Amino acid sequence: MDLELTGKRAVITGASKGIGLGCAVGLAREGCHVQLAARNKETLRDAEAFVLNVAPNIDVVTHSVDLSLSEDQKRLVNAAGEVDIWINNAGAIPAGDITTIDERLWREAWDLKVFGYINLCREVYADMEARGTGVIINVIGAAAVRPQPSYIAGAVGNSGLVGLTTALGSRSVQKGVRVVAINPGLIVTDRMGHILRQEALDRFDDEDRWE
């Protein structure tokens, strides 16, 4: 399938593994030059090698950043330059109900995913609007539309991000920019496996019953 993306420039956050790496590989196969952002330099190097093995003729750039920090968010945007596609995917909201997730955990999780998405959308959208072109994709999660009490911080945060995406996207098309959300269902990434094991431990006192 040719999606007519050859030569386009894309940034993917949370790109060293899981859904983010899958997005990077898919775009690279379509001829996109990709920039991968994540915290861990070692896993970023592995991701870069993996993408280049799949698509050796595209450019791959890596950025080691902590996207829970506003200064790193701005540093990434400045380093990335003009891009055609921006995928917000970085986030690690812990499982737990209202009694087990304290304020510190809420804030730490939301600094990365909720405020990370908000701040990056604001920075990236302004540039895309000025150029009259671009796509922002927010990878959010099914908890936004199927909230569960055992994942309350994610349910609330994801619902807010759907609101952000819907509100921004409703006017962005008039400026030549598309802002859309993807709410993936259950995909057993490393992080989701950890969440499922924690839920199994809470419910059955046996983390091996997560499957």
Predicted features and spans:
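Active-site loop-to-helix junction immediately N-terminal to the catalytic Tyr of the SDR YXXXK motif
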Residues: 101, 147-155, 167, 195
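Alpha-helical segment proximal to the catalytic Tyr-Lys
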Residues: 126, 170-171
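A short, exposed helix-loop element centered on a Lys and neighboring polar residues
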Residues: 121-122, 166
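Conserved glycine-rich Rossmann-like NAD(P)H-binding loop of the short-chain dehydrogenase/reductase
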Residues: 30-46
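Short, flexible catalytic-loop segment of classical short-chain dehydrogenase/reductase
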Residues: 145, 184-194, 198, 203
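Catalytic Tyr-X3-Lys loop
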Residues: 84, 92, 99-118, 133, ...
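Conserved glycine-rich cofactor-binding loop
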Residues: 9, 16-18
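Conserved Rossmann-fold SDR core element
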Residues: 27, 162, 172-187
